[in-house]
């Protein structure tokens, strides 16, 4: 399973992972009842992708709200990216958010502090 697509629901984000382009997109709210069930396929996909060599991976985030378990899952994904970056794999994150939602901007900044790879935070008007 090289492509991954998970439709958005009222409590889960749209997730799309494209093997050919090396782009993983997550958009929307994330407060699922079972974040493990939602994010484990994503973590598995990222692990498989990063194990395939030195191909660039870009994570594009437009997350509006994350509950605690979703934050932990995103940390797991960023840890995989950090490990790959340490091995010379080109990885990047771009987190776009509504400028009126300061809480999400602050959360993105907190994540960025723990990352040594390129991590852009873009406030949209």
Go through each PLM region and give its residues.
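A short interface-forming secondary-structure element
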Residues: 29-33, 63-66
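A generic structural motif
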Residues: 120-125
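Short, aliphatic-rich beta-strand segments
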Residues: 22-28
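Amphipathic alpha-helical interaction surfaces in cytosolic regulatory modules
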Residues: 39-42, 58-111
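Structural motif
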Residues: 23, 57-58
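A short, well-ordered alpha-helical element
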Residues: 12-16, 31-55
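N-terminal amphipathic/basic leader segments beginning at the initiator methionine
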Residues: 1-19
């Amino acid at each position: 399973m090289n492509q991954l697509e998970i439709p958005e629901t009222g409590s889960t984000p749209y997730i799309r992972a494209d093997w050919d382009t090396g782009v993983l997109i997550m958009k929307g709210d994330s407060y699922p009842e079972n974040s493990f069930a939602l994010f484990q396929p994503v973590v598995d996909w990222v692990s498989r992708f990063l194990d395939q060599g030195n191909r660039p991976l870009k994570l594009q985030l437009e997350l509006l709200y994350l509950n605690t378990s979703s934050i932990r899952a995103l940390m797991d994904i960023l840890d995989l990216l950090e490990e790959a970056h340490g091995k010379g794999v080109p990885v990047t994150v771009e987190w776009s958010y509504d400028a009126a939602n300061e809480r999400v901007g602050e959360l993105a900044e907190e994540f960025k502090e723990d990352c040594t790879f390129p991590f852009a935070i873009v406030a949209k008007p």
